[in-house]
Swiss-Prot record:
The lineage of its organism: Eukaryota, Metazoa, Ecdysozoa, Arthropoda, Hexapoda. Keywords: Amidation, Neuropeptide, Secreted. Pfam families: Periviscerokin. This is CAPA-Periviscerokinin-1. One of its GO terms (biological process) is neuropeptide signaling pathway. The modification Valine amide is found at V11. Its main location: secreted. It comes from Praedatophasma maraisi (Gladiator). The keyword Amino-acid biosynthesis does not apply. Belongs to the periviscerokinin family. The keyword Secreted applies. Mediates visceral muscle contractile activity (myotropic activity). GO terms for cellular component: extracellular region.
Length: 11
């Protein structure tokens, strides 16, 4: 889910 990516953005 996109929300999951926003929760912990991997640099």
């Amino acid at each position: 889910e996109a929300a999951g990516l926003l929760a912990f953005p991997r640099v």
